[in-house]
Amino acid sequence: MRYALVCLIALAAATITFRVHAFECNQYKWDQLLDSQLTAENRYNDYSKEFNLVLGIFKSHIFLSKQFSHQELISFWKQNNPYFQRQLNLQIETARQAYKLLLKQAHLTQIEIEQVIELRDGWTSTAESCRSQSQEYQYMTAQSHVAHTQTLISDYASLSDKFRNLALRYLNESNSILSAKQAALGDDLDLK
């Protein structure tokens, strides 16, 4: 019994020691956090460039559901013209592919948010460690990194929303054309 108690106390002491060392106010921890922050910022810049490219494509894309009324789209399907139907089916497929890709990007940027939250929490813990060691300058610097990572979290969330909103525009395009097809041809089509 006494041996078990000694082992339990030793385990608790090791756990406490590990936790303290995990967030020490030292050069190694700072370098780790700075590397992680630089990586997160670079990935954000890459996602932003990708979004801007996609936005340019989106702005130049012709959305049939915006160019033509629902009745006009129905009339294209009713004409039973193979050329029109091929073009409409191609538009549906293109819109669905764009929807899936943009939704994937929204999901990937959401995953990045989780990683940046961990980074912010690391800076917060390091700041507290610096404060407890009376290293006021390091504490203030770490706090500025906490604020910066919080801004990065907001930027990622905004970017994720933008990807998601573009994805929904493409989904609406696909669904509008499919709805017109269903109305014209009476098919029981999947609108998802």
Where in the sequence are the language-model features?
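N-terminal signal peptide c-region/cleavage motif recognized by signal peptidases
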Residues: 17-19
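C-terminal amphipathic alpha-helix
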Residues: 26, 30-33, 44-48, 115-192
